[in-house]
């Protein structure tokens, strides 16, 4: 890349525990991922890209380092302290002058403090619960939404993790007028506990019609 060519922004959008065929691009008949589908349909689609591990942490550590779990020594969701590598993707972007951000689920060897901006969410809500709404929603996820919660989530969309995360990610990106950035938007969903504006009982009826 020449000195005159502006550096491209790099955004990784990730979902957690989602089957590859549960999206419109792969022919799934319900519009559950319309925005992701629009990206997939207008860009390159790698239909033979497979994860290196069926567990979260090994796969994420491999994504950041380009190394197999056998090389990183991280083979489970509980041993990132064993992580072995020389340099990861985050360090490379920083060396190239990129601003860096994480919004969402980490679950890798990197730390929140390694990013210029970090808003961490996990399956049970925002890690740093700054507002009463954050606390109330985390209580719901921890105590009422465990297992198979079959009703619509009793919170508006704006209070639920996905919408909050996208809102924060967009706000940060719009502030980066003078710097190229790398941003990792890592959705904890659709991994349970589930959040939905639609009753799961209604969804079951729809699925039976497919």
Predicted feature residues:
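Alpha-helical elements of Rossmann-like donor-binding domains used by nucleotide-donor carbohydrate transfer enzymes
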Residues: 35, 62, 88, 164, ...
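A short beta-strand-to-alpha-helix junction
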Residues: 6, 29-32, 50-55, 79-86, ...
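Loop/turn elements at helix/coil->beta-strand transitions in domains of secreted/extracellular proteins
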Residues: 6-10, 43-47, 96-100, 177-183
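Glycine-rich, phosphate-binding/catalytic loops in enzymes
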Residues: 3, 27-32, 56, 81, ...
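Catalytic-site neighborhoods of secreted/periplasmic enzymes
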Residues: 65-158, 165
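Active-site-proximal N-terminal segment of extracellular/periplasmic enzymes that hydrolyze or transfer
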Residues: 4-44, 53, 94
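Active-site-proximal cap/lid insertion segments
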Residues: 5-8, 17-25, 128-163, 171-210
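Short, solvent-exposed turn/loop segments enriched in Gly/Ser/Thr/Pro and often Arg
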Residues: 26-27, 43-65, 102-113, 186-191
């Amino acid at each position: 890349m020449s000195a005159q060519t502006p550096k491209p922004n790099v955004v990784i959008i990730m979902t957690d525990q989602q089957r590859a065929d549960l999206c419109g691009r792969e022919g799934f008949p319900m519009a559950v991922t319309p925005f992701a589908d629009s990206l997939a349909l207008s860009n390159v689609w790698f239909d033979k890209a497979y994860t290196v591990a069926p567990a979260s942490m090994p796969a994420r550590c491999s994504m950041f380092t380009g190394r197999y779990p056998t090389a990183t020594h991280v083979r489970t969701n509980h041993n990132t302290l064993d992580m072995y590598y020389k340099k990861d993707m985050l360090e490379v972007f920083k060396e190239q002058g990129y601003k860096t951000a994480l919004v969402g689920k980490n679950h890798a060897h990197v730390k929140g403090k390694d990013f210029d901006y970090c808003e961490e969410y996990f399956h049970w809500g925002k890690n740093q619960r700054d507002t009463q709404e954050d606390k109330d929603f985390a209580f719901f996820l921890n105590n009422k939404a465990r297992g198979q919660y079959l009703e619509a989530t009793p919170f508006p969309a704006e209070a639920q993790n996905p919408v909050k995360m996208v809102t924060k990610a967009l706000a940060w990106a719009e502030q980066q007028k003078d710097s190229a950035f790398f941003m990792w938007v890592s959705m904890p969903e659709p991994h349970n506990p589930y959040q939905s504006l639609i009753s799961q009982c209604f969804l079951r009826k729809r699925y039976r019609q497919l």
